Swiss-Prot record:
UniProt-recorded Gene Ontology molecular function terms: DNA binding; DNA-directed RNA polymerase activity; ribonucleoside binding
Swiss-Prot/TrEMBL keywords: DNA-directed RNA polymerase, Nucleotidyltransferase, Transcription, Transferase
Organism name: Rickettsia akari (strain Hartford)
GO CC, alphabetical: DNA-directed RNA polymerase complex
Keyword check for Amino-acid biosynthesis: no
Subunit architecture: The RNAP catalytic core consists of 2 alpha, 1 beta, 1 beta' and 1 omega subunit. When a sigma factor is associated with the core the holoenzyme is formed, which can initiate transcription.
GO biological process: DNA-templated transcription
InterPro entries reported in the protein's UniProt record: DNA-dir_RNA_pol_bsu_ext_1_sf, DNA-dir_RNA_pol_bsu_external_1, DNA-dir_RNA_pol_su2, DNA-dir_RNAP_su2_dom, DNA-dir_RNAP_su2_hyb_sf, RNA_pol_bsu_bac, RNA_pol_bsu_CS, RNA_pol_bsu_protrusion
Protein name listed in UniProt: DNA-directed RNA polymerase subunit beta
Top-rank taxon, per record: Bacteria
Pfam families listed in its UniProt record: RNA_pol_Rpb2_1 (PF04563), RNA_pol_Rpb2_2 (PF04561), RNA_pol_Rpb2_3 (PF04565), RNA_pol_Rpb2_45 (PF10385), RNA_pol_Rpb2_6 (PF00562), RNA_pol_Rpb2_7 (PF04560)
Enzyme Commission number, as recorded: 2.7.7.6
Nucleotide-binding listed as a keyword: no
Length: 1373
């Protein structure tokens, strides 16, 4: 709630947010970003660009798709359809109406299109404009996002999960030696576009370079280089350096001495300086690059090599005869001994050869000479044959295909991200607008790949977050839109070509159904559009922040290896290392870290504080994984003095590759904002997370999402300080939209008058209608409760009402209960949980679950179905809960089998008897044959009817119940309108009064005469309408009054108009599915108390099932008589290593004891035994300096604050920065307890002390949605399987329990022959036997006969299908 420091009217402290004692040491300089902004920014800001003027819209999202698809021209270029702008109309129904009526919350997309018709002169070919038509065209309804970041599709709330996929760009990797038996590394490169064909380049085991397009058959890489227009000479010159060998008479060849080409080795011949003839090193001596560098520095430029050294080298240009200029050998050819003789014979003085050595291999040259294609045409045709096998090749088709593959922006798109990644990896500077491949790209990809093969550079890590990006909602829907618009483009071109273009309008050309069907399909069936997990507010928020590697264009869970699933150093501060599902999706579905955000390129960024010259400053900078690699980053817990200077000689820092180094303070570039930035929202709610084993923390964060909202919410005594943020951002609580004063409050709504003065001087009124007992997606109950009282001042974004699982604006998933760790008669064996009867009695873990049942009255072939109370063959007793229409009353208590809605269906007429004929002839009535098709409560359900909704088809007369519901809703709307009007009137007339008092009247009314001065008493005698009739002398005052009147009338009209529109919507009838006349929905609420078999869990991954409910008097109790609520097994701790729960228990024990101490002090103060100073001192000791602003207040307010502490002091222990063991001990000491946290406990059954001290404390426990009521069921009689005639299985089929093979063994082991016989026959599939048994039970006899089980007959039939005729013959004895 509103904090004291900025409270205007100094409200009493009761109307205030909860104050927690915080153990955190690190000051937060950055707030947690809005937890659902990832969804809202992506869709509303980047895709739809809602509420942005057309001229100011950027070329992204919907705007960019429409710009790229339009203009559309026909084949002859006569007609041209251009895009002008787009806008959205207001949605027909609001969010609440859509979810009630099972509709999609969507707004109509209106696109303004311009159709230009051209006149083309056939002789000259010149074009003239013949006509232009501009029109707004409806392009279908586009789903809108609700304020909570979800979509409503067909009445259900859905979330579009963000997808992690490999970023477009170029990636280099090797096979890790797995492919070739020798373990040789085979390097490859892959170009991944955003859309278009993939290009792979790869080495084979013989070091020849190949390429593939879309994983088709491989071709030589030089074919690709020739296809982009490179000649042999260009290829060789681009990839190799050249060196010239000069002839030295009778001595050999002189060649330039280049140290970088030399590797360490022993010389096979002398190293001789070519200029002086001096021997530098003898044969057999070792030369190293360092020694070579030394010789170079000493001025050695050329060295002498033997004649035969040239053998085996490759020519770097054509070898020509000096006399005739005839080509003797082509570029790239190897010099053989024969060729060397020719060189000597022709006295060729200079020979240029390629520099090929261990640092630069001959791979490209070898590939060139292996490749048969010698020119561009042959290369293109070869590529064409691979991609289009069986088609006749011609050069035009081949050229067109190759161009379309990589160089046509309509078919190939690297995206801006892909271009940036490509430029940075290849060291290019091509413009970011060029999103197709260029010739430079291809040349350089080959170059980098060859350099990798030569040992230069490193391969890419595909799991690095710089190489994986996030596709959020906006982008996913943008891709669907593009598909839909491309399909629509084809139909537009067809329609342009088909008809007379002169007469058509733009709307005749556009078929919006194509686009709508694609968008609808995405929202209904895509793997990434998911039914929202709405168990509690945390599960909602987590679902919206989820990152999935699965889905279209992503990985498949069967093929994903260990590396993809593993935690990567770049996940730090971006993806939570803890929260991921157990099972086959582990590591593929992740959660974003608390502080992470997604940048415009789709990379996840994490915030860091800047460090300048060893001093930490408050500037926060977000870095992506790529940028982070350039810096040294210290941890958030690095020691810092008051001035922000880093303490210590060395600071532990993270550097690229996830390594840690120790550096001096001035070398540090950034430090983490907070230790909490590493984990996700769910993990950040676990106190003492640092003391838990990772596996258990994973379970803890996952199980918090399964906690069902309880009737009474209770925030944890031991929290982490994040509870308030989660409650606020989840949308479960109601936030004030403006500052204001609370005018009215009840359980259904809150009315707030704002303080903000408008132009007209009248305040606006905000009415917040609260949700009462609504059903969530997971059948839990959504119920909101007001937190404010009349007269309270609230600030914008204050929480004014709690939602499900929230308590005073903080998330509250479970309850604080008193727990003891000790074994108790084996009832807490293997994680079982023993609970006290008090928990059931006081509804501590009771939850409400709401189920929806629907019945549809349809128009059938034989006539309409009817919803009625008049049902054939049903007793009056069965109809007791139904009204005269046949629909159940709200508030009725129902159980399985009760009728909820009476419905009859016409059935085909049976032949009529003569008597009936006579009766019909006399009375003229046709007694319809109808059958009962009423809606009954299914088995296993019981509860109270909380709501009934009736929907009638437009044009169908409404029944009395529908009219009553409608009347109720209209009254509610009228009350909202009247209250708002009343507040506005009150303000307007008080303003008028201020203006009129003291003015002189010009015109007279009955009660007042002209010339009189107006007084307050005089105005009290006038009606509201007469205020406006008064005219006064002051012209300025009259102007002001006129202005107020105009604004007042406008507001009044707007209110009435809004009311009329809503009423019209209610009265107009509903759009129902085809053939439906009426739909009735009944909502039944069931109270689930905690019972044996229910699953419970703590926040540390400690889960168990309730085994027994023990009477309070038998439970262990403390020395003061307090009975323990829950007994847990201490053996569940050591092996699981989630010690956090013990620290939580100890701190919880301190919490309740401190609260008792505070209440004792308050009692003593009230009895005048102590002064306020003693209480102040204790509070200061407990809360520290943070409490000073409360201690400065009046005595009453301090006592009010103490009373508000209630049953426990609230603590916040942030993850990785929370209370240490010593802090917990200090709190226990302050509370007057033993620092061990253990106490003497008395056995409730014997009244004796337990032998040793027991750990007791307050622990936060959750009830999970695995309730025993939804799992266990029993069957008496029910359906049988058609073939085997055995009872069906499973709760949904009302099936039996399978008595399997091992169960049969158990009976055999005990020799229970008769039990076994009846299990296998009459209780299973002996059809005749079970009929006879039924008969004998009805007659009251106790004997039964069993016959042949049906499964035996099935087996015989199977034998017969194998041509074995097995008969069962009875032989007479």
């Amino acid at each position: 709630m509103v904090s004291l420091r900025d409270n205007i009217e100094a409200q009493p402290l009761s109307h205030n947010r909860r104050i927690r004692k915080n153990f955190g040491h690190i000051n937060l300089v950055a707030d947690i970003p809005n937890l659902i902004e990832i969804q809202k920014n992506s869709y509303e800001k980047n895709f739809l660009q809602l509420n942005i003027k057309d001229s100011e819209r950027k070329n992204k999202g919907l705007q960019s798709i429409l710009n790229s698809i339009f203009p559309i021209s026909d084949s002859s270029n006569i007609a041209n359809l251009e895009f002008v702008k787009y806008e959205f109309d207001t949605p027909k129904y609001d969010v609440e109406e859509c979810s009630q009526r099972s509709l999609s919350y969507a707004a109509p997309l209106k696109v303004t299109l311009r159709l230009s018709i051209w006149d083309i002169d056939e002789d000259t070919g010149t074009r003239e404009i013949k006509g232009i038509k501009e029109q707004e065209v409806y392009m279908g309804d586009i789903p809108l996002m609700t304020k909570n970041g979800t979509f409503i599709i067909n009445g259900t709330e859905r979330v579009v999960v963000s997808q992690m996929h490999r970023s477009p760009g170029v990636f280099f990797y090797h096979d890790e030696g797995k492919v070739h038996s020798s373990g040789k590394l085979l390097y490859s490169a892959r170009v991944i576009p955003y859309r278009g064909s993939w290009l792979d380049l790869e080495f084979d085991a013989k070091d020849v370079l190949y390429f593939r397009i879309d994983r088709k058959r491989k071709l030589y890489a030089t074919t690709l280089l020739r296809a982009i227009g490179m000649s042999t000479e260009e290829i060789i010159k681009f990839y190799y350096n050249s060196v010239t060998y000069k002839l030295v008479k009778k001595k050999g060849w002189a060649v330039k001495f280049i140290p970088k080409h030399i590797t360490a080795h022993r010389l096979t011949s002398d190293l001789v300086d070519a200029d002086t003839g001096n021997v530098l090193l003898k044969a057999g001596q070792k030369i190293t690059p360092r020694l070579a560098q030394k010789y170079c520095a000493e001025g050695i430029n050329n060295i002498l090599v033997a004649h035969e050294t040239l053998i085996g080298k490759y020519l770097s240009e054509d070898l020509r005869d000096p006399a005739s200029d005839e080509v003797l050998a082509k570029i790239g050819e190897i010099i053989t001994s024969d060729m060397l003789n020719v060189i000597n014979d022709l006295k060729i003085k200079n020979v240029n050869v390629l520099v090929i050595n261990p640092q630069s291999g001959p791979y490209i040259r070898n590939t060139l000479f292996a490749d048969k294609n010698q020119d561009r045409e042959a290369a293109l045709c070869d590529i064409f044959r691979v991609l289009r096998p069986g088609e006749p090749t011609n050069i035009e088709a081949a050229e067109s295909l190759f161009y379309n593959l990589f160089f046509d922006s309509e078919r190939y798109d690297l995206s801006e991200v892909g271009r940036i990644k490509m430029n940075s990896r290849l060291g290019l500077s091509i413009s970011e607008e060029v999103t197709v491949l260029t010739i430079d790209d291809i040349k350089n990809i080959v170059r980098v790949l060859v350099e990798l093969k030569d040992g230069k550079g490193i391969i890419d890590d595909i799991d690095h977050l710089g190489n994986r990006r996030v596709r959020s909602v906006g982008e996913l829907i943008e891709n669907q839109f593009r598909i839909g618009l491309v399909r629509m483009e084809k139909s537009v071109i067809e329609r342009m070509s088909a008809g007379d273009v002169d007469t058509v309008m733009p709307h005749d050309l556009v078929n919006s159904k194509i686009l709508v069907s694609v968008v609808k399909e995405f929202f209904s069936t895509s793997q990434l559009s998911q039914f929202m997990d709405q168990t509690n507010p945390l599960s909602e928020i987590t679902h919206k922040r989820r990152l999935s590697a699965l889905g279209p264009g992503g990985l498949s869970r069967d093929r994903a290896g260990f590396e993809v699933r593993d935690v990567h150093p770049t996940h730090y501060g971006r993806i939570c290392p803890i929260e991921t599902p157990e099972g086959q999706n582990i590591g593929l579905i992740n959660s974003m870290a608390t502080y992470a955000r997604i940048n415009k390129h789709g990379f996840i960024e994490s915030p860091y504080r800047k460090v300048k010259d060893g001093r930490v400053i408050d500037e926060v900078i977000y870095l992506s994984a790529i940028e982070e690699g350039k810096y040294k980053i210290g941890q958030a817990n690095s020691k810092v003095d008051r001035d922000g200077k880093l303490q210590g000689e060395f600071i532990n820092c993270r550097v690229e590759g996830g390594n840690f180094v120790m550096v001096e303070p001035h070398e540090v570039d950034f430090i983490d904002v907070t230790p909490m930035q590493v984990v996700s929202v769910a993990a950040s709610l676990i106190p003492f997370l640092e003391n838990d084993d990772a596996n258990r923390a994973l379970m803890g964060s996952n199980m918090q999402r399964q906690a069902v909202p309880l009737i009474k919410t209770d925030a944890p005594f031991v929290g982490t300080g994040v509870e308030g943020v989660v409650a606020k951002d989840s949308g479960a609580s109601v936030l004030a939209l403006h500052d204001g004063i609370v005018e009215q409050v009840d359980s259904n709504r809150i009315v707030i008058r704002t303080l903000e003065q408008k132009i007209d001087g009248s305040p606006s009124v905000y009415i917040y209608n609260l949700l009462k007992f609504q059903k969530s997606n997971h059948n839990t109950c959504i119920n909101q409760k007001p937190l404010v009282q009349v007269g309270h001042y609230v600030k914008k974004n204050d929480i004014i009402a709690d939602g499900p699982s929230t308590d005073n604006g903080e998330i509250a998933l479970g309850r604080n209960v008193l727990v003891a760790f000790l074994p108790w008669n084996g009832y807490n064996f293997e994680d079982s949980i023993l609970i006290s009867e008090r928990i059931v009695k006081e509804d501590i873990f009771t939850s409400i679950h709401i189920e929806e049942f629907e019945v549809i009255a349809r128009d059938t072939r034989l006539g309409p179905e009817e919803i009625t109370r008049d049902i054939p063959n049903v007793s009056e007793e069965a109809l007791r809960h139904l009204d005269e229409v046949g629909i159940i009353y709200v508030g009725a208590e129902v159980k399985a089998g009760d009728i909820l809605v009476g419905k009859v269906t016409p059935k085909s007429e049976s032949p009529i008897t003569p008597e009936e004929k006579l009766l019909r002839a006399i009375f003229g009535e046709k007694a319809f044959d109808v059958k009962d098709s009423s809606l009954h409560v299914p088995s296993g359900v019981s509860g109270t009817v909380v709501e009934v909704r009736v929907f009638s088809r437009r044009g169908v007369e409404k029944d009395q119940r529908a009219i009553a519901i409608e009347k109720q809703q209209i009254e509610k709307l009228a009350k909202d309108r009247d209250d708002e009007l009343e507040i506005i009137e009150h303000f307007v007339f008080s303003l008028l009064e201020k203006l009129l008092v003291g003015q002189v009247i010009i015109n007279g009314l009955k009660q007042v005469k002209a010339g009189q001065t107006i007084t307050t008493e005089m105005l009290k005698g006038l009606s509201k309408g007469q205020f406006w009739q008064l005219t006064v002398e002051d012209a300025n005052v009259m102007n002001e009054i006129e202005q107020i009147k105009i604004h007042y009338d406008e507001k009044k009209d707007a209110l009435n108009k809004r009311f009329a529109t809503k009423v019209e919507k209610l009265q107009s009838g509903d759009d129902l599915p085809q053939g439906a006349l009426k739909v009735v929905k009944v909502f039944i609420a069931t109270k689930h108390k905690l019972q044996p078999g229910d699953k419970m869990a703590g926040r540390h991954g400690n889960k168990g099932v309730v085994s027994r409910i023990v009477p309070e008097e038998d439970m262990p109790f403390l020395e003061d008589g307090t009975v323990v609520d829950i007994v847990l097994n201490p053996l569940g701790l050591p092996s699981r290593m989630n010690i956090g729960q013990i620290l939580e228990t100890h701190l919880g024990w301190a919490s309740i004891n401190l609260a008792q101490k505070i209440s004792t002090l308050v009692k003593e103060y009230k009895n005048k035994n102590i002064g306020i100073e003693k209480i102040k001192k204790f509070l200061l000791e407990l809360y520290g300096e943070n409490i000073n602003y409360i201690l400065e207040r009046s005595e009453e307010e301090i006592i009010s604050f103490c009373n508000k502490v209630g049953k426990g002091v609230y603590f916040a222990t942030p993850v990785f920065d929370g209370a240490k063991v010593q802090d917990v001990k200090d709190m226990l000491k302050l509370a007057g307890q033993d620092p061990s946290g253990q106490v003497k406990l008395i056995d409730g059954r014997t009244g004796e002390y337990f032998d040793r001290l027991v750990t007791v404390g307050q622990k936060y426990l959750l009830k999970l949605h695995h309730l025993v009521d939804n799992k266990i069921h029993s069957r008496s009689i029910g359906p049988y399987s058609l073939v085997t005639q055995q009872p069906l299985g499973g709760k949904s089929h009302f099936g039996g329990q399978r008595f399997g093979e091992m169960e049969c063994w158990a009976l055999q082991a005990y020799g229970a022959a008769y039990t076994l016989q009846e299990m296998l026959t009459v209780k299973s599939d002996d059809v005749n036997g079970r009929i006879k048994t039924y008969d004998s039970i009805v007659r009251g006899e106790n004997n039964f006969e069993s016959g042949i089980p049906e499964s035996f007959n099935v087996m015989i039939k199977e034998f017969r299908s194998l041509c074995l005729n097995v008969k069962l013959e009875v032989t007479s004895s």
